[in-house]
Amino acid sequence: LSFNLHRNVVFKNADVPGQPLGYMEYSKPENLWKGLDKYCNEDTNCESLTIPHNSNMSGDMMFRRDKFNVQRTDFTPDYVQLRNKYEPLLELYQHKGGSECQRGGKNGADEFCEFEKFPFNNLIADRFNGFLTGEPGEQSFLRYALAEGLNQENIHGTNPFKYGVVGSTDTHLGTPGLVDEVEYLGHGGAGADNGGGSEVATGLTDLISF
């Protein structure tokens, strides 16, 4: 159902692995971190971190481990240390909605939980008018992760969700400062959403799931 679980991988310098760590070989988050441990380390003068985004559209899977293995293995000391090492940041806001807290969650009314909420829990839903989706659950949001991180620290001695937060546009234009709403070029640069009646450029898309 196209749950959003991918990460941005950011390298400190130009010393990077010889080839990308692709999904076919590293389909689970912890396998990505293990691959970085193997190919991007002190011996290769390489350093990196991963930044997950759109946890609100992860189908309650972003902060779980048992969903990614047949054995339903939960958190272990090695896992929480690995995640703590490679994932110090979380993207909290972008144009696919806020990932801080669930709308109408168990803690009651909170204006921050009503702001910029995307009504789907996966990336494919907007193409089918909400079909194949539901409201994002509590486990898709940062506040859940922060509390669960403290719980795991009590158990394993390390907090896997000790996050700083970032906000971004999530456009695919390579222009992080291009945030003018009047001249908005759209998510993919086609300009379909700028209200000016301009034609959509061939080969570009402005689907929110792009």
Tell me the role of every PLM-derived stretch.
Residues L1-F210:
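Extended, charged catalytic domains and RNA/DNA-binding interfaces, predominantly
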